[in-house]
From Swiss-Prot:
<feature type="transmembrane region" description="Helical">
    <location>
        <begin position="4"/>
        <end position="24"/>
    </location>
</feature>
<keyword id="KW-0472">Membrane</keyword>
<dbReference type="GO" id="GO:0005886">
    <property type="term" value="C:plasma membrane"/>
</dbReference>
<feature type="transmembrane region" description="Helical">
    <location>
        <begin position="32"/>
        <end position="49"/>
    </location>
</feature>
<keyword id="KW-0812">Transmembrane</keyword>
<dbReference type="InterPro" id="IPR009760">
    <property type="entry name" value="DUF1328"/>
</dbReference>
<keyword id="KW-1003">Cell membrane</keyword>
<protein>
    <recommendedName>
        <fullName>UPF0391 membrane protein gsr2640</fullName>
    </recommendedName>
</protein>
<comment type="similarity">
    <text>Belongs to the UPF0391 family.</text>
</comment>
<keyword id="KW-1133">Transmembrane helix</keyword>
Length: 53
């Protein structure tokens, strides 16, 4: 559940930073969002798996 929450937060932050305001732009960038979110979650999982943050 916590990972899903982080996924939503990361996607919202990325969308805000990249300036995707429209639904069409977001739909065209779903693959990009998924790639970035997967990388971020992998890094967070790796760090939290090795260290207690």
């Amino acid at each position: 559940m916590l990972n899903l929450l982080w996924l939503v937060v990361v996607l919202m932050v990325i969308a805000a930073l990249l300036g995707f305001g429209g639904v069409v732009s977001s739909l065209q960038s779903v693959a990009w969002f998924l790639i970035v979110a997967a990388v971020v979650l992998a890094v967070v999982g790796f760090v939290t798996g090795r260290r207690a943050l």
